Amino acid sequence: MGAYRYVQELYRKKQSDVMRYLLRIRVWQYRQMTRFHRAPRPSRPDKARRLGYKAKQGFSIFRIRVRRGGRKRPVPKGCTYGKPKSHGVNQLKPYRCLQSVAEERVGRRLGGLRVLNSYWVAQDAAHKYFEVIMVDPAHNAIRRDPNVNWICNAVHKHRELRGLTSAGKSSRGLGKGYRYSQTIGGSRRACWRRRNRLHLRRYR
């Protein structure tokens, strides 16, 4: 078993004395830093490598802090309109996970880089901390690497804003089987469009 395998097993037992101490120290350290900053190296090298990170030119790690809790509905001057059933403002739950929100915020700040993936690093009562793996599509080390140069294509710009990363896909309801009948055809919208379209068959 390699060294990364041992590190992976450590992170599976987050309630152990070692991990509780380590995460407590790290959360304190992250709390002193700004909300968004570049990390010199990944805090979880085993996880980063499993998600595609390489310690080479063109790859970078950015750490971001996201506020925990539900999403308050943005209503101007408290005007919700419609029927009382849809007047809720406070107790609404967001469709997307906080990890997907973190990827989006990093991607917006760094428009010239591409979001490859992200992972959880720590959390406290008020915030969750994620590290996002960014790739520079203009760097020659990336463009010449056959394993990762797919991300240089223009079609992969802002993958995080279109739900194409691992965290983004989790909230799209994609899958196979009877539980995922609401996304047959590729997406919720495609499924709705197919079911609600008027089909006028021509019989000859």
From Swiss-Prot:
Keyword Ribonucleoprotein: yes
PROSITE patterns assigned: RIBOSOMAL_L15E
InterPro entries, A to Z: Rbsml_eL15_core_dom_sf, Ribosomal_eL15, Ribosomal_eL15_CS, Ribosomal_uL23/eL15/eS24_sf
Gene3D superfamilies named in the record: Ribosomal protein l15e
Name used for this protein in its record: Large ribosomal subunit protein eL15
PANTHER family assigned: LARGE RIBOSOMAL SUBUNIT PROTEIN EL15 (PTHR11847:SF4), RIBOSOMAL PROTEIN L15 (PTHR11847)
Record key words, sorted: Ribonucleoprotein, Ribosomal protein
Molecular functions (GO terms): RNA binding; structural constituent of ribosome
Similarity remark: Belongs to the eukaryotic ribosomal protein eL15 family.
Swiss-Prot/TrEMBL GO biological process terms: cytoplasmic translation
Keyword flag Ribosomal protein: yes
Pfam families associated with the record: Ribosomal_L15e
Cellular component GO terms held in the UniProt record: cytosolic large ribosomal subunit
